[in-house]
């Protein structure tokens, strides 16, 4: 199911996702990237407002950005190969964060 998301450039790391009940929820963007192998853009995000010591669930979606860059459409990750790539990139990202 595609979900609408948008963000305000003043809050560059926040996206708002409308859930199945029509309620908007804020999510903080961990990072986004483009994959040439799958010809898609991806975003990894988690519920906003979580403390640094709290365990968080990181979510991943592919997305299509609108022409103005203010809104887009989240799409589910479709294949095991995509998940493998995302997990590898996330592991590298987290390892780099631990080194800092």
From Swiss-Prot:
S-S bridge residues: none
Domain of life: Bacteria
Pfam families hit by this protein: DUF1292 (PF06949)
Residue ranges of the TM segments: none
Family: Belongs to the UPF0473 family.
Name of the protein in its database record: UPF0473 protein LMHCC_1068
């Amino acid at each position: 199911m595609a979900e609408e998301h948008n963000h305000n450039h003043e809050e560059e790391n926040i996206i708002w996702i409308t859930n199945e009940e029509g309620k908007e929820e804020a999510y903080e963007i961990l990072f986004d990237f483009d994959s040439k192998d799958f010809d898609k853009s991806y975003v990894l995000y988690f519920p906003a407002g979580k403390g640094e010591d709290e365990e968080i669930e990181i979510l991943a979606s592919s997305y299509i950005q609108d022409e103005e860059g203010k809104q887009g459409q989240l799409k589910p990750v479709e294949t095991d190969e995509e998940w493998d790539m995302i997990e590898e990139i996330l592991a590298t990202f987290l390892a780099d964060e631990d080194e800092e």
